[in-house]
Amino acid sequence: MKKLLRTLILCLTAAALSAGAICPAAAEAEDPEGQAVIDLDLSRMSGTIVYSQVYNMLYDPEPWLGRIIRMAGYYNYYDDQEHGTVYHACIIPDATACCVQGIEFVLAGEHTWPEDYPEIGADILVTGRLEEYEESGVIYLHLVDAEMTVEKQEE
């Protein structure tokens, strides 16, 4: 039974990943209202698929570089005081919330930290263009020219 379940999950993940991989290249395209076309909308996928897709993007970023990605998760940051840099990220847990993946983002325009950012753990929706950069000899990925909205909490 476990083998069947594992095989089913792998097949569904592969199908979802290949469906995303054949999206038309439209990183600079715009819809009729002038909005950037979203190449991959992770905010509409299940936790397992999102976690798998983000892992795939981090493992093999080449097909996704320059593409517009939208993702929902929760906000977190890292204040690197040694280098004077604050890194902002959209964190995505897997379906069981035991493991997390995250992608750093850089908001478009001028923003001040912490005034222009939500509290840690706030539910956010981030849309930006996936790019890579090098820092201290290591290649990292981030969403640039990003827009972030804070999702309202249900009370």
Residue locations for each model-derived region?
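OB-fold and OB-like single-stranded nucleic-acid-recognition modules
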Residues: 6-7, 19-155
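Sec-dependent N-terminal signal peptides
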Residues: 4-15
